[in-house]
Amino acid sequence: MSITAQSVYRDTGNFFRNQFMTILLVSLLCAFITVVLGHVFSPSDAQLAQLNDGVPVSGSSGLFDLVQNMSPEQQQILLQASAASTFSGLIGNAILAGGVILIIQLVSAGQRVSALRAIGASAPILPKLFILIFLTTLLVQIGIMLVVVPGIIMAILLAPAPVMLVQDKMGVFASMRSSMRLTWANMRLVAPAVLSWLLAKTLLLLFASSFAALTPEIGAVLANTLSNLISAVLLIYLFRLYMLIRQ
């Protein structure tokens, strides 16, 4: 059977519309979890204020130079802030991926589904999803730091891995290997969707500061919710595509 991107886009749009409220609630809940965890593990406002003390920002030629000019205490605060942001984001993304994929599975099985039921049902696979998303994010970031293009290629090749991990109950590394093979053989169907996702995420990041006009916390929840909705659309597309390829 010939698979066209247009037919998968249409199926994705129909599913997203039919399950919009459930997906929205999952996205909102994951955004709230991300923001709360980030706030809990981040340094205090007083500690963050110390980052500006005695650091010659204007005289620094780059990020590494700026960090080197910091005191050991300031470097520790920066590391804690970065780790808190990364950890909370990974937790939120793992719950989102598990919740959305379980929504698709439950709906496909003809069962009634709610946001809490989907997230609860995904609990057993969340540890593996967390490790998978951590490794994927690490590889993509390393690739982007090198020449950008390798990072984008890794993002494309590993995009279906969460779907394969949950749907076929694979291990972390097995799902990564299978994802690379499947994507390489179907690059024309996977690459445009992932590139569109990356573009949408980038545009959202550019306008994220405007959400802070409300309050920083509410703005962060709204921005994360929109980001999660974008990721949910990609997950639905990849799940549908994977099911068609397997037939």
UniProtKB/Swiss-Prot annotation:
A Pfam short name: UPF0259
Subcellular location field: Cell inner membrane
Parts of the chain that traverse the membrane: 20-40, 87-107, 118-140, 152-172, 187-209, 225-245
UniProt keyword terms in alphabetical order: Cell inner membrane, Cell membrane, Membrane, Transmembrane, Transmembrane helix
Disulfide pairings: none
Record keyword Transferase present: no
Membrane-related topology note: Multi-pass membrane protein
Recorded GO CC terms: plasma membrane
Location (main, coarse): membrane
Family under the similarity heading: Belongs to the UPF0259 family.
NCBIfam families associated with the record: PRK02868.1 (NF002774)
The protein, known as: UPF0259 membrane protein YciC
Organism whose genome encodes this protein: Shigella dysenteriae serotype 1 (strain Sd197)
Lineage of origin: Bacteria, Pseudomonadati, Pseudomonadota, Gammaproteobacteria, Enterobacterales
Gene name, Swiss-Prot/TrEMBL: yciC
